[in-house]
Amino acid sequence: MPSVRLKENEPFDVAIRRFKRTCEKAGVLSEVRRREFYEKPTAVRKRKAAAAVKRSMKKLARERARRTRLY
């Protein structure tokens, strides 16, 4: 869990904004949403495989775009 210490003479609203930003960077809310309901191990494997395919397609598209810009 991210923590934020109040600085000297810092408004509470600013500290809340910093806390929200650190939570966003740490991925706390997305993790909570992902763990809200039980996910079967097969569903986990399927989701991870789909993410790997998406990453590889994105990498391939970037390579193709870079290759076409060279000419």
UniProtKB/Swiss-Prot annotation:
It comes from the Bacteria. InterPro entries: Ribosomal_bS21 (IPR001911), Ribosomal_bS21_CS (IPR018278), Ribosomal_bS21_sf (IPR038380). PROSITE patterns: RIBOSOMAL_S21. GO terms for cellular component: ribonucleoprotein complex; ribosome. GO terms for biological process: translation. Keywords: Ribonucleoprotein, Ribosomal protein. One of its GO terms (molecular function) is structural constituent of ribosome. The keyword Nucleotide-binding does not apply. Belongs to the bacterial ribosomal protein bS21 family. NCBIfam families: S21p. This is Small ribosomal subunit protein bS21. The lineage of its organism: Bacteria, Pseudomonadati, Pseudomonadota, Gammaproteobacteria, Chromatiales.
